[in-house]
């Protein structure tokens, strides 16, 4: 009877829908809550129990087929890789999910309990990646770090000089950290391992796009250390609004207007750079953020902002508490974020103009010298910007560039100079700007004015050459880089707002460059600058325009400011200067220059301008001749462009300068130790003599050894120029006389005779030829007459002889030797040369006299031949106006000549050997007849006639 009851147990195999449905969806093999069949689920356990108890073989293959699925998917279904760790062999347990590190696609690595325990305690790589490459040692403590793994990216930092360092050592040294390959490691500085992981998971959010991590990496490395550090700190240590840093899908580059942040490494991290970041926020219309919200500085680098009020939906519930996450970051005392200044973007009181809402220490930093109410024309918006920049700067740059100088600049609201430029440029190029000038520079413009450098105009810069030489380091630091010598045109704005186009180029100079601005003459003339004045160069940010200002010389500013200074001592407004215009409200408005630079008042009519010009000229001391008109309204042109007083040429022929004609080795011999005994100091076995007084300049002496072998020295008296013999150890002062001779009482007076004559002394002492002539020149100076131009040939011969001064200066060429006889080298400077007496018997004077005697004899013969032949002779200047009779008239030719001519004829003779110096009164004085040809004596030159007329008897 039991046989009919067999069909009911066969229903489970017949009930094919459950297995078919299970086989139709083999991918959904997951835990029970993910099964897609809720109705048969409660009936399946009883059927399974009955099937196991009645007939286990039939349901077992179907159940295995249901779990395995198709043959192609059999291996992954047999050994499911649930744990994300590739080195973990244990499948995932029934426990909750364990989140590990974040993946590149935005998901999290799902780990088992064992792997998660290793990851949580920071030993994941030490447990599973010991055999994997990429291990390096910490440069400080030697700890092993896995640098080639995404799991350990938060455990180390990159050093600037190369190598890596663990986070603990980096926290101790407070080193500036560079970003890692994908994420910044600076966010983990103030947290332990567990807090680092939690904060990393909560705050990190990947940007959209296919190459998000690569774009983030390139963007970080293209910025400076300051930018990347600021960007990453604001991105991870603070809870930024959702979507503010997102990129549009497919965007892998930065716009051109964002590229100006990339060159911030060329500028110092001064408040100007931070003000520029905060000011850029209002320029782009992001007015929803507060000025003290630190998340906005990160938003500037990613301009694809969305609604900042939306929360990040990628964060799980309970993990996006802004205040909790922020407190977790700032609670650590080692954190670089100040805990006294609460950076929370949800406090509306900071947006108000209430002074009580301003944090302590910020309101006083921006007050000017005029009082706490004057904020240097800074509105509420600018005040918030400066407070934000100051707070950010105190947080991120407290160990780098903040010093007393920059704190003083913060009080003025503008930087004086770039910190990098101050360390590179010479002090004479530093822009010297006072607080008042800085206040007028800021004006009503929202732009930041950064003084770059200044340069004093030289005579060539202020001349008509049309070029301004720039300091090399200043040009390379602030002007565009040029590779060709032709350069490029450069637009520069002057103090009145007018734009000038200069040619910025360089000249190759000894493997270097000399940078110049060409075409600056019209600009300098419009500013009425001259040599000695100073031109200043500044930069207007963020436009990057160059501003060329000026400042008058200090020796003229006091006198020029006198007419325009008011009686009450208050500086006049900008309208009182004709070199400064009222600044416009536009960003490109002219920058007003300092008040003390300008010296003239602005006039509204030509008459007032002429009056002002007269007043300005009357305040300056001018040298005007008798024909100079001082009432002209036009500016008087300067004849000389030299700076300061005119430097006269140093005359080397003066008696005082003769003492300087010694070499450096000879000057060392003149140094004598002080009279006091020195103190002996032994340092490392070496004895040193220390004197309390400096060495003195002693008298020059000559050490001589006589025939008997005795050593002594010879010195010359300062008064009588006599030589005295002194002991070897005698130390003489610079003004030594015979009265100071305490070693020889017989010759302690200038009246005493010299021991030996000059010939014997010259054999022992190497006296220069100029030494004796120097003393003789003092006596015979009054008896020497000025030589004339006819002695040029004599000068050449004298310079060739050894009797003259060897150091006689001439206007010779730079590379000519001292014995050069060219027309340039033989000319003495300023017409001064060797002087000869009338009775001089040197070779040159004798040669000149013989030459003159020969010329006179030839002339007499010619005149005699003319008289004999009856050829009419040309009238001379001294002849009378009577006509010369022709030959055959019966009258003697000499009877009709003038008395002067007769006297000249009688005066000519062989005994005439000298030239009278009275000839210097002739109109042809000091002239050389270069056209004179002795072989052509038929024509007489006027010079020879004048010489013959002024000649007298040599006796």
From Swiss-Prot:
Zn(2+) binds at residues 717, 720, 738, 750. Pfam families: B3 (PF02362), zf-CW (PF07496). Residues 453-554 bind DNA. Residues 332-342, 556-565, 598-608, 878-900, 920-933 have a biased composition (Polar residues). InterPro entries: B3_DNA-bd, DNA-bd_pseudobarrel_sf, Znf_C2H2_type, Znf_CW. Residues 1-81, 325-392, 556-642, 856-955 are annotated as: Disordered. Residues 1-20, 29-45 have a biased composition (Pro residues). GO terms for molecular function: DNA binding; zinc ion binding. It comes from the Eukaryota. Keywords: DNA-binding, Metal-binding, Nucleus, Transcription, Transcription regulation, Zinc, Zinc-finger. Residues 343-355, 862-877, 939-955 have a biased composition (Basic and acidic residues). Residues 62-71, 382-392 have a biased composition (Low complexity). Its main location: nucleus. GO terms for cellular component: nucleus. SUPFAM superfamilies: DNA-binding pseudobarrel domain. It is found in: Nucleus. PROSITE patterns: B3, ZF_CW. A zinc finger (CW-type) spans 708-758. PANTHER family: B3 DOMAIN-CONTAINING PROTEIN OS07G0563300, B3 DOMAIN-CONTAINING TRANSCRIPTION FACTOR VAL3. This is B3 domain-containing protein Os07g0563300. It comes from Oryza sativa subsp. japonica.
